[in-house]
């Protein structure tokens, strides 16, 4: 009987130690995660905002889900290299969304050592020449692509951002009055 009680006690001590260790690891992880800067907060809000699409049903995260390495969340589609529907469910993109987790590492499109490197999209068309960053140029594409978020113009995108809950943050990052939709092309470059 004492041996059973002893084993039970030892099991409880081990379980308790594991729980305390797990709690410590989780709290340490939380402390190690730095707070987002205002521009990072704004980017995160834009990335997850489904209202920035034709039908209010698709965000960047719809096809680049952080939970699955920033690619599409449907494993069957990913396994077969198929495409995802856009904001208009009758239209489909022209390729499976690539993982966006490493996207910031591509650099400017350039010819180096006999090969083209850098840029964004499969064909490098977001070169970085316009905004100085191919990732920033790439991020603009899906909003106006009829196969993706399907908005019709930079003005429509600007108005949707202006109707969002983060206009004060947008002004904090880009300056008061930055969401002037009469200057939608300039606003589009900031989004």
What function would you assign to each model-found segment?
Residues 1-2, 26:
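Intrinsically disordered, low-complexity regions enriched in serine, threonine, proline
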Residues 2-14:
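Bacterial N-terminal signal peptides that target proteins for export
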């Amino acid at each position: 009987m004492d041996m059973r009680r002893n084993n039970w006690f030892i099991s409880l001590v081990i379980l308790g130690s594991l729980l305390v260790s797990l709690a410590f690891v989780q709290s340490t992880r939380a402390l190690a995660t730095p707070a987002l800067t205002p521009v990072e907060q704004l980017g995160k809000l834009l990335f997850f905002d489904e209202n920035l699409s034709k039908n209010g049903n698709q965000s960047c995260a719809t096809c680049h889900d952080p939970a699955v390495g920033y690619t599409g969340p449907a494993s069957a589609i990913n396994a077969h290299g198929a495409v995802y529907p856009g904001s208009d469910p009758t239209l489909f993109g022209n390729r499976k969304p690539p993982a966006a987790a490493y996207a910031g590492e591509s650099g400017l499109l350039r010819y180096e050592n006999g090969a083209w490197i850098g840029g964004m999209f499969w064909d490098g068309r977001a070169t970085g020449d316009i905004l100085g960053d191919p990732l920033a140029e790439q991020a603009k594409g899906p909003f106006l692509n009829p196969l993706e978020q399907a908005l019709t113009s930079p003005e429509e995108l600007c108005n949707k951002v202006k109707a969002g809950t983060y206009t004060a943050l947008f002004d904090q990052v880009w300056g008061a009055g930055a969401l002037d939709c009469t200057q939608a092309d300039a606003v589009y470059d900031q989004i």
